C-alpha cells in the first residue's frame, strides 16, 4: 500500500536547504524510484511512495547522506507517515517544475 511521508525541518538554513536539494538531485533520478508525488517547501516535504521500502531506500541512500554532508541528521526532523487510501490529483502537466527542488 502507498504511504504518505511528511518531513518537517525548521532547523535548516536556506543555504543548507539548497545544498541538500542539489546533492539529492545529483545523486539519482528525480523523482526517486517509487516516489509518486512530492510537494516541497523550505520547512516541509510531503511525499507519496509506492511502499515504505522505497521511501526508506531513498532516505538511507540519498537524503540521509545529503543531510550528513551538511552536518545535519534526519534524526533531528519531525516525521509523520500514514497509509494512502486515495490519491486524487488534477492535471499536473501545466504545473511549473522547479529545477532546484527535490526530497
Predicted regions and their residues:
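Short S/T/G/P-rich N-terminal loop/turn motif that feeds into the first structured element of a domain
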Residues: 1-46, 50-65, 71-103
Amino acid at each position: 500500500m502507498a504511504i504518505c511521508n511528511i518531513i518537517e525541518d525548521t532547523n535548516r538554513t536556506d543555504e543548507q536547504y539548497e545544498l541538500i536539494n542539489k546533492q539529492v538531485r545529483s545523486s539519482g533520478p528525480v523523482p526517486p524510484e517509487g516516489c509518486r508525488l512530492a510537494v516541497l517547501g523550505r520547512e516541509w516535504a510531503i511525499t507519496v511512495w509506492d511502499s515504505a521500502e522505497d521511501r526508506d531506500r531513498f532516505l538511507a541512500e540519498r537524503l540521509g547522506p545529503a543531510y550528513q554532508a551538511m552536518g545535519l541528521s534526519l534524526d533531528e526532523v519531525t516525521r509523520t507517515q500514514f497509509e494512502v487510501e486515495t490519491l486524487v490529483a488534477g492535471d499536473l502537466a501545466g504545473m511549473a517544475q522547479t529545477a532546484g527542488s527535490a526530497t
